[in-house]
Amino acid sequence: MAELVFHTGPMDSGKSTLALQMDHAQSAHDRQGVRYAMHDRSGGARITSRIGLSVEAVEVTDSLDLYQDIVSRLSRGGRIDYLICDEAQFYRTKQIDQLARVVDDLDIDVYCFGILADFRTELFPGSKRLVELADRVVEPPVSPLCWCGRPATHNARIVDGKLVREGDQVGVGDIGGGSEIHYEVLCRRHHRQGITGEISRATLSEQTLPFDGSRS
């Protein structure tokens, strides 16, 4: 029986790598699949992992009907046993519903990969719907670490060196006004306190041991 599975974890937890491994494992057993991606880090229609692996994928746009896309491929004589859906947190709610229909009506396995919550600790709409509909929600086998060594559970948006808690849910590269943006995974404590790895290192560097240079 086909199922809808949501693999979710914070940034740097290897979700895209796992998606590529899943695709490889499925195809190695003579199963035919379709790969989907949205807002990939490469900027193109690909699934790209942080360790350098990359494959072509179908670009998911807001207007793409995933169920009809699969039906169209099948009607042309294609064989589809599974779907790999990367960056699924960005998918529209109705597209998650369409994926559930692919599982139920077409008996095709759907494996989704994505972040659960944004930098504001609010659920992405696509992820929220996946939690509501998925047959299984799976955490990645490898957990990233906060700079303090604790398991990292929160995604932080850093703008000009400072952690921010407001702004558009989706932000890539520059966010305008000459500001530089990047992301960092933190434990809940340091996300709540707004202490990033850079701030921690700066604080430590300012701490000096008492030393009297006049003594020999």
UniProtKB/Swiss-Prot annotation:
It is found in: Cytoplasm. The active site is at residue 87. It holds the Pfam family TK. Keywords: ATP-binding, Cytoplasm, DNA synthesis, Kinase, Nucleotide-binding, Transferase. This is Thymidine kinase. GO terms for molecular function: ATP binding; thymidine kinase activity. One of its GO terms (cellular component) is cytosol. Its EC number is 2.7.1.21. Homotetramer. GO terms for biological process: DNA biosynthetic process; thymidine metabolic process. ATP binds at residues 9-16, 86-89. It catalyses: thymidine + ATP = dTMP + ADP + H(+). InterPro entries: P-loop_NTPase, Thymidine_kinase. It comes from Cutibacterium acnes (strain DSM 16379 / KPA171202) (Propionibacterium acnes). Belongs to the thymidine kinase family. It is an enzyme of class 2 (transferase).
